[in-house]
């Protein structure tokens, strides 16, 4: 993509309304525009990152055996009355009526609808286990939306829902999602720590939040530093095998949010040198809620003994849009964003340091063609901005690799390659650049 043809509305000054780093940098980098309190338009740069995060989430859900569908944003109020949550959910749920006076709501979550879909089609234990997921926009009418995408009113979520004939099967499904989440966040360059959590309005008796450590996080957390060094399963993990050892490895090391923190246990189990009391950002949460929804909504299957029994369920959420904020909070410096390569809007940016110079233009065009032909996402800054402004923009938007092309270097057949993550630079022969990056 040539920057001269791209829509990138960079802001030179820090927006006054931005309270935290991620919100400030997303606005300055032209990724978002606020349309109302907690509601944003996703501009092209932000949308590219959003789609890359979404694809990683999708790939890991598929790898773990979940099946994608898509449910509507609007739901019938009667479904929520059936489960008993319509009145319990509170003012965060946006309730509306259509022209026929039918009561609807803008879904904050989908346990009721997925249970209704399940009970309409699944009648026998032979169709289980089953895990269905979707990636969809949601709305919660936060009283005080703030911090950009970290606490907005409209947000993109991945929600998965598992169905099993008994508790043992449901816990196996829970373990699959636990491992899938470890892999999902690691692929995005994040160290997300699973922590025992309260179940809240979802219900059930087992839940883990996945927390990314950040000083601006909304939750206080207490961890044993050993959890930071635990290995994440690789892509060859056997989801049909016994995942219990992985779960035990991650849950046997102390890690808790302030809501469920046990000070006495923390002090007795964790050596003082290993204690870390900091803050974190929740990027996902998983729940086992047993028969909570199948009991109230009569989602039963015929078991092996011929009798009907309610299914055991779980739900598993990832804040897809929220992850952009979490990644920026964890990956930035004074100059801007530092995107991990897997989620970067572009992998490489070419900076033409003397637009209009024949040799410089030709070298940049050659690099742009050759890298693009190799499947590399390239943003080519072919604008007439001065070099200093181009450097500042490249650092702000956080592209992992910068290629600086100017007459002085080309006189020696060289260009400069800069790595955004550590600022390291190397001079390469023009002919070697493509091989270095592919």
UniProtKB/Swiss-Prot annotation:
Pfam families: HGTP_anticodon (PF03129), tRNA-synt_2b (PF00587). One of its GO terms (molecular function) is ATP binding. Its EC number is 6.1.1.15. Gene3D superfamilies: Anticodon-binding domain (3.40.50.800), Bira Bifunctional Protein, Domain 2 (3.30.930.10). Keywords: Aminoacyl-tRNA synthetase, ATP-binding, Cytoplasm, Ligase, Nucleotide-binding, Protein biosynthesis. SUPFAM superfamilies: Class II aaRS ABD-related (SSF52954), Class II aaRS and biotin synthetases (SSF55681). It catalyses: tRNA(Pro) + L-proline + ATP = L-prolyl-tRNA(Pro) + AMP + diphosphate. The keyword Nucleotide-binding applies. It is found in: Cytoplasm. GO terms for cellular component: cytosol. One of its GO terms (biological process) is prolyl-tRNA aminoacylation. The keyword Transcription does not apply. PROSITE patterns: AA_TRNA_LIGASE_II. Catalyzes the attachment of proline to tRNA(Pro) in a two-step reaction: proline is first activated by ATP to form Pro-AMP and then transferred to the acceptor end of tRNA(Pro). Homodimer. Belongs to the class-II aminoacyl-tRNA synthetase family. ProS type 2 subfamily. This is Proline--tRNA ligase. It comes from Rhodopseudomonas palustris (strain TIE-1).
